[in-house]
Structure formats: C-alpha cells, structure tokens
Amino acid sequence: MNDTATVGGKGASLGEMFQKLSGIGVKVPNGFTLTTAAFKQFVEAEIPETTWNNIGAPEDIEELRNAAINCSTLASALEVCLRDADPKDHLNLNSRASLARSLVRETPVPDEIKLVIAQEYSKLCELYHPGVDVAVRSSATTEDSADASFAGQYESYLNVSGEQDIIEKWRRCVASMFTCLLYTSPSPRDGRISRMPSSA
C-alpha cells in the first residue's frame, strides 16, 4: 500500500521499513506521522484576532498584511501572502515569506491535533522510555515530485522531547515550507497551499 499521498515520502518509507525489517532483526526506530488531513485541519482553522498582535510586516507589504487580517482562516491568509508574487523580486518574496512564516508560528494548533500528538508520543514513551527524544521532520508530498524538488529545504528538529515541544516543532516545520518561496518560480503552486505531513 502506497501511503505517500497522505504521509509523504519520508513517513511512508519509515513505516514500510519498520513493518518489513523489524521482524527480521533490523533495528528501525518507530515513529508517527501527522497526515495531510492534519495539515489541512490546521490551515483551515480560524485565526484568532489576537494572533495579529504579534505579527508585524515590513513596510513594502503592509497593505498585504492588512488584506490578510480580513481573512478568516490561516489558508486564506497565506494565499493572500503568496498571491501575485513576482518571482524575480527577491526582496518582496522574502518579506512575503517572512509574513507567512510568522503567521503560521503564531496561529494556535487545533486541540484535536494536539491530542493526536500527545497520544502517539505517549506510545513511543511506552515503547522506549519516558521523555524519549524524537526528530521532527517534514514529509511533504511535494518534496520530490516530477516537476520540483524541495528535499532538505524544510526544517528538521532533533532531540525533541515532550509533547508540547513536538507540537511547537511541528508548527515550525509547517512554517518552514514558506522559506522555499525563494527557490521557486513562479510562486509556489500559484498561491495555493500544498500539503505537508510531518513525522516524529
């Protein structure tokens, strides 16, 4: 069964190796992956008004920030950040990417996703030991596609311990997808938000 479309390449490969190799004595660390459905739930969540109190914007995109404030969901605000971006204007792209990353980092993670992370991390603690360290990495479905490769351009976090830290690092993994704006031409998916699962 190919799960790449829902958990990305890294997540699918880790699951396959654990299932096939653990039984024959090859040590493969267990883990879990938040799916594209979790990513969708996060970006479709409403943005609390107070979120914007911690988000500034460079002068060259102040109007863009004001337009994004009127959006009800994270996804729609992010699409405003990306829309009509000029891939040749690197300074403007950098400002847009910075605004998008700040927005993701400040938007609360839905309670349902927090619960899933807590439950899955608890299973790893039972399997290994309490407070076990994990790596939080992107497993994006678009990292290595037929027309683009973003491998190594998203953030990875090592030695992460505790459910709260995992939640924060997952959110930062999501935010890091907007660092790749500078490497894409034209703007990523023409302003549409791609799917990013993440693995721990």
Per-segment meaning from a language model:
Residues 187-190, 194-200:
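Positively charged, low-complexity/disordered segments
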